[in-house]
Amino acid sequence: ASDVYKRQPYNQAVTDGTKIPVPINVGTSVDYMWGKSTNQVSVIETDARIPMKHALSQFVVRLKVSPEYHNDGNLTSAKLKATGAKFATTGTMNLNDGGKITFQPTSTELTWSPNTTVPAQGQQAVDYAAAIYPMTLAAGEVSLEVVIDGATYTYAIPQITWEAGKRYIYSITMRSNDAEIGGENGQSVTI
């Protein structure tokens, strides 16, 4: 009897389940999936039951407008900026260690160019999502910087652990003279 593992997307060239390449493409929110059989597979028990899990975290910028906001509401840039090397776009996943991803931090920024327009007042909020490696952030270590209608807004992200398989939503409500950002803990800050 043995365990059976599965990973998506599948890459035929990968032969070592402890070092599966998991690159992040900052242009998409593509996640990687992995799973381990919940039953032992053998000659007698040939069906493997494999529940799948997400390998990455999802970072979401949610855009809304208040009634007094009258600009176009165009989000042209979103950045995560760290005080030291915190980010990477290449890492590996270890199936024998619960799908844990390891990476060597090489960059102080992750930058996206979403070109997303904030919806008109009364419309649903618009989400811009990006896949990121799971990690723990200390208070003040990372900030979110967005450019909306040419104005730059910066928000210091409080201490948090971005876990695999979870979404971390940062809501931005555009108002006439400023923006309000709400983070993971539900508290909002005017920027």
Stretches with model-predicted labels:
Residues 59, 142-144, 155, 170:
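Hydrophobic residues positioned within well-ordered beta-strands of beta-sheet architectures
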Residues 2-79, 111-131, 148, 161-166, ...:
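Short, low-hydrophobicity acidic/polar segments
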Residues 153-160:
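Edge beta-strands of extracellular beta-sandwich domains
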Residues 68-105:
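Short, ordered, surface-exposed loop/turn motifs in non-cytosolic proteins
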